[in-house]
Amino acid sequence: MTSDHEQAQYRPCVGLMVLNRQGLVWIGRRADAPNEPEGRGSWWQMPQGGIDLEEDPRAAALRELTEETGLRTVEVVAEHPKWLNYDLPSNLIGKAWGGRWRGQRQKWFLIRFLGDDSEVTLTPPPGHQMEFDAWRWAPLDQLPALVIPFKRSVYDDVIATFAPLVRPLGS
């Protein structure tokens, strides 16, 4: 016999590793949001978000990037060849996202930011919640230690896949 949460589906999402010209990765500190399953204000992560019904993952990635960070001056460098899943901890299954999802199924993209840091805004568009309350550029090897533990295996896979492409622009 399986429990309800074992039968729950994964929320379709995208994730974005955004590089600046120096080869550093954009990370945001999770904003303190009520009922937020992914960590309140103490964890950092790369941008990610849901894919709308019938939306193409690449289009969703660019939309989510703009909604969460304000970044528009970008180019897509690569797409992860696989969909990656993570499960929520058992204490959050049935509570997070209205109890509808057991975790997320993510398609990751490597994005190069070609603009100026002044383009970043953490103020969300109308009707959206603030995702991050701070941001910075970080070296790739720092990411696993900064992310909430239940996402680390996904981050390890994303880093291993994209690391050969992470370098300063022009090198």
List where the protein language model places each region.
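Short amphipathic alpha-helical segments enriched in hydrophobics
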Residues: 26-29, 69, 166
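Functional cleft and adjacent loop/helix regions within the main domain
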Residues: 43, 92-98, 128, 163, ...
